[in-house]
């Protein structure tokens, strides 16, 4: 506001009435929510203590406002709040001219979504102003004009739209989660300056939009992260209004979030997290759930409503099962963030910051060994993130900064290195492979998991992110790969690793919230925890294209096989070996079969029988069977608005170096085979290409795909159909991985990715003297000249690997 708008004067001028918005009436009088007379006097003190706790959780504690990064963050907060203060202009239908919530035709269409978002945004701006008023070092600390503006704004939004007489319109989330949370956060910060009448009105509005009935059933929009957010809305409303019943109801309603699920939204025993029925979302809603539960656990600890549910340990276990496998050197992998990757101003790195802070917070209530392990992980991730160090993020909040700085300053915490492991998430069609110097992950789709999600105008060109997208990062390079305007500029038909028809798809193909799923079942794989085999029966979105794709994850490489590639779309089908983002001016050397290729933009060439290729500073690529390899250097221009209606329209240009195989128009049973060597030098790549005995491709057809790597003692086969490959026979579709160890033992791991095997027999034609361990799923095992394993009904295993240990000889 250019000048202070006195709260009561404004309401008098406005007549204290609500804008019609196509709706009717003003907020009705509601009884006060203060503690009843028969409650103990200590009740108010307990609520005051909880408000103080929440205030600390919002603002952060334990930092010096004159030390960096806090000094700069506080100054930035003050600058933002001052901008809001200067531009605030209460009027009918808005609190700011650029945030009009008045909807002339309130319903649930896209326009109404936008109007309701402006109401939510108005509360968020008031929260920022309240934080600047409450925090030291902002230049607005304790400023009377700021406080008056916040109180005026709260009254205005309540009078106009967020009240008991307004009917919800647009996006339900804005009315039940976004606005209530921002409103209650603000009320906590300025609580001592609110009148009883204001508290009553604000709490009544929350009760109106978030009635007790939202907790009646764990379904619809009241599951997973949304349930946690709804609980937070009501718990804070109870604390602000000192209503014990509200706090008790909402705290108890967290219980369904903790147990693992076997279908629908929530965490699964394998570490998968699903929201919106079939979308992997650890980096989005999963992060929200973790943050919400973490804060509420901390808030209620030691109170009458402390969460003592034994299933909270299941939630804590998801740190290691679900969160950590997708964080690499300070980033959260894009393939578990869905629509979030299309949002301007965010990246794999910025999305990880909240999770890192959450791990620090929830660790305070975990077992000492868990807390120590998580703090070590967080410290290692922060120290290794050379591209976007969390404490230098311009959007970092004060509470997150305080949490992360505390870990960095703690000399008792030694940074944990990246683990060496392979993780299969068979309930969300993802796999991660982590080495000390690099990490990779594959993104797939099936009857259970959507190709992608489009909604709210977000993620308009994500249609091929489930087509075998293989993303990877190096420890000292490549952390910027998908974070430097990758999504608005990359060719969406040439994501790394995918096989796709060039048939043009419309933005948002599949429909708003359509979440299209292919009608295929065999998607998944198996792993011994260090190496892995993953497979995808791929059916293209709105396409006739079919393919069988496999990835075999080794110590320093990933073997990628494709077969049965068939299409009748009338368009070319391509497999993208890799598509390296080079920033605004990158031009790394490309070498193919020992010959350096031109570096100018616009260059392209097809190599008829390439054996290997190398991109300086990135990776090596080996083609064991030779490949008709196409390469292109190009500059691509796009805008965030192209993929997200909420993004800016400013054009951005980035360079790309793409390697791909063109299978031709309407191919029949086309194949490919290549090996990705992240971080390898040209010399190492050439040596690997020349070592004909290192890798044996045992099969690469539409029926089976398999490899053998003698030096690793590894044999892995994806059986799309029953058959025999080398020394392994499967009686039905299955994924099999065998590791022979130097101590004379071997590990055999088998899964049923299609979830259809009511019986399965796997035979390894290798002399075995004894079965050392086996799961209950193995109903019979015979040894001798061959190992024969008989499995019972595997449909209830949901594609989980079954591990057997045997003694050779």
Where are these regions (language model features)?
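C-terminal beta-strand-rich structural cap/linker in extracellular carbohydrate-active enzymes
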Residues: 673, 788-809
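Extended polysaccharide-engagement surfaces of secreted carbohydrate-active enzymes
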Residues: 296-311, 315-759, 764, 768-770
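N-terminal mature-domain "stem" immediately C-terminal to a signal peptide or N-terminal signal-anchor/transmembrane
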Residues: 43-80
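Small-residue (G/S/T/A) turn/hinge positions that recur once per unit in extracellular repeat modules
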Residues: 776-780
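Aromatic-lined, polymer-binding surfaces characteristic
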Residues: 88-344, 348-349
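N-terminal export signals
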Residues: 9-31
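C-terminal segment of N-terminal export signals and the immediately downstream linker at the start
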Residues: 25-48
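Secretory targeting signals
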Residues: 1-5, 21
């Amino acid at each position: 506001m250019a000048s202070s708008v006195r709260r009561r004067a404004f309401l008098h001028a406005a007549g204290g009435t609500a804008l019609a918005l196509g709706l009717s009436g003003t907020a009705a009088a509601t009884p006060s929510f203060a503690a009843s007379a028969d409650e103990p006097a200590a009740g108010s003190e307990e609520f005051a203590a909880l408000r103080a706790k929440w205030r600390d959780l919002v603002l952060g504690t334990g930092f010096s406002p004159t030390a960096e990064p806090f000094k700069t963050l506080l100054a930035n907060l003050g600058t933002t709040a001052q901008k809001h203060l200067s531009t605030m202009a209460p009027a009918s239908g808005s609190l700011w001219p650029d945030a009009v919530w008045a909807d002339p035709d309130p319903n649930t269409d896209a326009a109404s979504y936008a109007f309701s978002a402006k109401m939510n945004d108005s509360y968020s701006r008031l929260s920022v102003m309240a934080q600047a008023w409450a925090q030291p070092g902002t230049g607005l600390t304790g400023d009377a004009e700021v406080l008056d503006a916040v109180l005026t704004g709260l009254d205005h939004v309540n009078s106009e739209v967020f009240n008991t007489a307004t009917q919800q319109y647009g996006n339900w989330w804005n009315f039940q989660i976004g606005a209530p949370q921002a409103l209650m956060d603000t009320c906590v910060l300025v609580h001592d300056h609110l009148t009883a009448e204001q508290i009553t009105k604000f709490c009544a509005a929350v009760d109106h939009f978030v009635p007790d009935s939202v907790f009646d059933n764990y379904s619809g929009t009241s599951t997973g992260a949304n349930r946690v957010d709804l609980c937070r809305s009501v718990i804070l409303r109870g604390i602000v209004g000192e209503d014990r019943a509200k706090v008790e109801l909402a705290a108890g309603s967290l219980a369904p979030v903790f147990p693992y699920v076997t279908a629908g939204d929530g965490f699964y025993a394998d570490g998968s997290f699903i929201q919106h029925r079939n979308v992997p979302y650890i980096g989005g809603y999963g992060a929200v759930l973790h943050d919400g539960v973490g804060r509420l656990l901390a808030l209620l600890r030691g109170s009458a409503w402390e969460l003592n549910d034994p299933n909270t340990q299941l939630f804590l276990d998801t740190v290691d099962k679900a969160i950590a496998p997708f964080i690499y050197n300070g980033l959260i992998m894009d393939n578990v963030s869905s629509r979030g990757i299309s949002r301007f101003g965010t990246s794999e790195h910025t999305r990880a910051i909240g999770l890192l802070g959450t791990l620090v917070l929830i660790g305070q209530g975990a077992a000492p060994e868990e807390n120590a392990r998580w703090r070590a992980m967080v410290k290692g991730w922060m120290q290794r993130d050379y591209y976007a160090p969390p404490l230098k993020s311009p959007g970092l909040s004060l509470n997150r900064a305080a949490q992360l700085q505390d870990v960095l300053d703690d000399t008792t915490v030694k940074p944990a290195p990246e683990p060496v492991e392979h993780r299969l998430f068979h309930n969300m069609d993802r796999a991660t492979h982590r080495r000390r110097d690099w990490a990779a992950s594959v993104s797939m789709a099936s009857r259970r998991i959507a190709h992608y999600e489009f909604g709210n105008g977000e993620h308009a060109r994500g249609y091929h992110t489930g087509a075998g997208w293989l993303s990877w990062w190096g420890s000292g390079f490549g952390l910027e790969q998908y974070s430097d305007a990758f999504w608005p500029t990359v060719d969406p038909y040439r994501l790394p690793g995918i096989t796709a028809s060039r048939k043009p798809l419309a933005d948002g193909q599949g429909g708003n919230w359509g979440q299209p799923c292919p009608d295929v079942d065999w998607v998944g794989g198996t792993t011994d925890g260090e190496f892995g085999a993953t497979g995808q029966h791929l059916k293209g979105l709105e396409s006739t294209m079919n393919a069988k794709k496999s990835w075999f994850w080794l110590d320093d490489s990933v073997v990628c096989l494709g077969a049965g590639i068939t299409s009748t779309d009338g368009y070319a089908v391509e497999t993208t070996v890799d598509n390296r983002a080079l920033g605004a001016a990158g031009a790394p050397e490309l070498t193919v079969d020992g010959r350096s290729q031109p570096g100018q933009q616009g260059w392209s060439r097809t190599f008829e029988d390439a054996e290997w290729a190398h991109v300086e500073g990135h990776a090596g690529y080996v083609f064991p069977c030779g490949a008709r390899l196409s390469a292109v250097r190009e500059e691509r221009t796009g805008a965030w608005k192209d993929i997200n209606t909420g993004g800016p329209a400013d054009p951005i240009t980035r360079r790309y170096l793409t390697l791909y195989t063109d299978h031709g128009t309407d191919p029949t049973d086309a194949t490919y085979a290549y090996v990705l060597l992240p971080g390898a030098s040209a010399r190492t790549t050439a040596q690997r290409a020349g070592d004909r005995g290192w890798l044996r491709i045992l099969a690469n057809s539409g029926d089976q795909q398999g490899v053998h790597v003698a030096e690793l003692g590894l044999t892995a086969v994806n059986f799309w159909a029953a058959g025999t490959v080398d020394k392994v026979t499967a009686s039905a579709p299955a994924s099999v991985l065998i590791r022979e160890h130097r101590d004379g033992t071997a590990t055999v791991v088998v899964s049923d990715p299609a979830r259809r095997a009511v019986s399965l027999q796997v035979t390894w034609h290798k002399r075995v003297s004894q079965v050392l361990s086996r799961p209950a799923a193995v109903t019979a095992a015979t040894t001798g000249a061959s190992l024969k394993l008989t499995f019972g009904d595997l449909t209830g295993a949901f594609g989980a690997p079954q591990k057997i240990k045997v003694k050779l000889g």
